[in-house]
Structures are given as C-alpha cells and as structure tokens.
Amino acid sequence: MAKLHDYYKDEVVAKLMTEFNYNSVMQVPRVEKITLNMGVGEAIADKKLLDNAAADLTAISGQKPLITKARKSVAGFKIRQGYPIGCKVTLRGERMWEFFERLITIAVPRIRDFRGLSAKSFDGRGNYSMGVREQIIFPEIDYDKVDRVRGLDITITTTAKSDEEGRALLAAFDFPFRK
C-alpha cells in the first residue's frame, strides 16, 4: 500500500474532520482519480509522434493510455472527425496513490524555476488542474531517448464539495501551493 494512502487514512482524515466539523468519516473529501492528458496536435502530420507520446504516458503512469480522437472536423486546424489527436490515462486506486506520491515528492520539485503551484486552479467543485510543460520532470522518462519535449495536463478529482475543502485536502498532503 502506498505511504501517502496510509498517511491519508491515519492523519489527513482526522485533521479535516476537526477543521470542517464533519459528523462522519465518509464526509471527509478524498482523492477519487487522477487524469493525465497529453494533446498531440502535430500527430496529424506524423503518427509516430502520437506513439512516442503514448509511450511517455505509459512510462509515467504505468498504465496504457487511451488514444483520444477529434470529436468534430476543424478546417483551420486541418483535422477531421475521428483523427487521433492525443492520449489520456485515468489513474484510480493504488496506482493513483503511487503516482500522487511521485508527483508531490519527485516530479514537482524538478520543475524549472518552480515557485509553487497556483491555488487558483480549482474548478469550483474541489477538483484541481495543473499543466506541466515538460514530461522530463518525471524520473521514468529517459532524457536521452526523448524525441520532443511535450507537456501534459494533470487533473486531480476529489470528492470535495467546494474549493476550500479541496484546497485543505491537497494542503494536508503538503501540496506545494504558492504563498
């Protein structure tokens, strides 16, 4: 079992119960899933780029990504409906906790010129989204084998009812928010 999951059960739940005066342990917000999304618009011209992006996402998450396809045709971007334009992975359970731990302890501190993550990136329902400009911050990616530096979106979906609860949940995990 991931250390962060044990930490959540033992300490975070108790801390949030007293902070928000919950009656039941089931009211305490928890991390439900983490979604990693990599948009590869250049895949229209070269299909190999999408394969490389999918391989990177597989290395980062430990799970095979789903290839996302264009929902509708856009002439300005030269894409047609059904063209593969990206890939995504949804992590839940044990893999999610292991990824979350690696994200907080290893990957985020390796971001260049890092001054903390914005606390304004909540969606109004306690879910947090962040963008990473380089996939090479993850130790699973071999810098020498990278064909192109590409970014990815990371969305942390929680059961929190408000941004305040979501922020308190992530702050309890020592999530590096900007002061």
Curated annotation (Swiss-Prot):
Domain of life: Bacteria
Keywords per UniProt: Ribonucleoprotein, Ribosomal protein, RNA-binding, rRNA-binding, tRNA-binding
GO cellular component, one term: ribosome
Molecular function (Gene Ontology), one example: tRNA binding
HAMAP family, per the entry: Ribosomal_uL5_B
Functional description taken from the UniProt entry: This is one of the proteins that bind and probably mediate the attachment of the 5S RNA into the large ribosomal subunit, where it forms part of the central protuberance. In the 70S ribosome it contacts protein S13 of the 30S subunit (bridge B1b), connecting the 2 subunits; this bridge is implicated in subunit movement. Contacts the P site tRNA; the 5S rRNA and some of its associated proteins might help stabilize positioning of ribosome-bound tRNAs.
Assembly description: Part of the 50S ribosomal subunit; part of the 5S rRNA/L5/L18/L25 subcomplex. Contacts the 5S rRNA and the P site tRNA. Forms a bridge to the 30S subunit in the 70S ribosome.
Name of the protein described by the UniProt record: Large ribosomal subunit protein uL5
Lineage: Bacteria, Pseudomonadati, Pseudomonadota, Gammaproteobacteria, Enterobacterales
